[in-house]
Amino acid sequence: MRFKRDDGSFDVGRFKAAVRLFITAQEILVDNASYPIKSIAENSHVFRTLGLGYANLGALIMSYGYGYDSEEGRALAGAITAIMTGHSYEQSAEMARILGPFAGYRDARCAGVDHPADDTNEPYMLEVIELHRAHVDQILDVPRFAALKDEARRTWDAALGKGRAHGYRPAQATVLAPTGTIGFLMDCDTTGIEPDIALVKYKTLAGGGLLKIDNQTVPSALRNLGYSPDKIAAITAHIDQYDTIEDVVDEQTGQTVASGLKVEHLPVFDCAFQPRLGKRSLHYRGHIRMMAAAQPFLSGAISKTVNMPESATVEDIVNTYVEGWKLGLKAIAIYRDNSKASSPVSTERSGDGATDGPALAAEADGKTFNALQSRIQELDAEVARLKAAAAKPVRHYLPETRMDMAAWTKASSS
């Protein structure tokens, strides 16, 4: 979202500048980082594998007025991922021109392989780059994002040309991480390559309580879909009140309350989870198709959850893995709704099946409610007693066991 201009165009120049900056910073870290075991330290220096990625893709797609499970969304994801990885390898080749390629580029034995299939990895590394480049032509043709596809093609041409001349400094450049809670610190509506969990969700806090999180991309999407400011205000107010953009039946009056959104625009706002008062959610195949749009342009794999409904069968789950394999995914993780006792993020206001005190009082008769309240007071008193009796916490410092490459070399020679 940070690279989307006010006129809706994607700022490729700033995006590529960010890619250059961070891939260079990650390359510098290889020689300044510490590693838990010697083999990881050695491999990190022989191949210099990095892991640049992005977050908030789902919000970017929604902001344009496209659904996550749409050809336009997949075209945008493919083009942006292609530019990111292609320019990372272009910068990798530029660093190789000055510093030399990674140690295993021309010497296959330096990785500790006694009898490698070939003395050098150079032709195989170039073959990998050529495969990435060939997939650019398979990005879906969408007029609105045609310029991004053209830029992706130019970027991979440059990465291949410079790599043939100089080799590559990092052997691996990109992966897609989940970005989890840190995504909230980056002001993201969505994490990694994920769609939004729900337009309104509730995060369970470690210290107790719930944090209500509203999707901030909805107004931008509605503007792109042609809604007036008054309509946008009414729709966002509906979402805030009912936790969904769908028409709902009011729980108090029993009357249908319309959100004001046109039926044909509902798929734009489909999310991973079904909202409390709604019926819509993304089909699990939509998750797989989005991953397949990005995977050909990544060095590594994608860490992403494929959300499946509670009604999913064993056959559905098997088919999901098989379909992911057929589409060339390197990894796949499935979450079946309600398969865990608790969840850090949910669409329920009370979270984890908990019920607010007033609601509980209304549902239970007076005698039952009083008994429950008495039991709660007893438990609170027991917790207070245990806290008072507990010993003060003692801080135990971890040993200095992590070493950089120089330390490993010194330890091995002594």
Model-derived regions, located:
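Long, C-terminal-biased catalytic regions of enzyme "large/alpha" subunits
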Residues: M1-S414
